Amino acid sequence: EILYMMKEVQIQKQLSYIYITHDLSTAKYFADRIAVMYLGSIVEIGEANEIIENPKHPYTKALISAVPDASTGRANIIKELPIKGEIPNASNIPTGCRFHPRCIYAKNECQNTETMLKDINSSHKSACIFFNNI
C-alpha cells in the first residue's frame, strides 16, 4: 500500500525518486531507468524493463532471481544462479571485477581486468566483460 501511495504521489506531483532497494521488482514499478550497484560501483544501468527482462551482469541476474515470481517462472532460477562466498570487506575491495569472488561466471581475467561499463545498446550498459554469455 505504501508503494501504491508513493507511485500515486509521483504521478500527481511529477516527482522523481532515488529509490534504493535490493528488490528490483519494486524498482521497476517506480523507475524508467535502473542502476545496479555492487560495492559502491555501478555494474549495470539501463531502461527498467530491459534490466529486468534482459540482465547483462551476474549480480543483476542474482538480484532478480532472488525475488520469486511465479508468473514468469523465476521461482526456480535462484537454484541455477547461486552467489558464491561472502560479501567482500568494503575496505578491501577485490582487484579487477569487484563481483568476481562471488560470480559463477568468473574467469581468470575477471581478477585482473578493471571492469568498465560497456554499451550493450544505446541505453543499456554492463560492467561484465562476459555480458554476451549471460
Language model regions located:
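Charged, flexible cofactor/metal-binding loops and thiol motifs
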Residues: 48-134
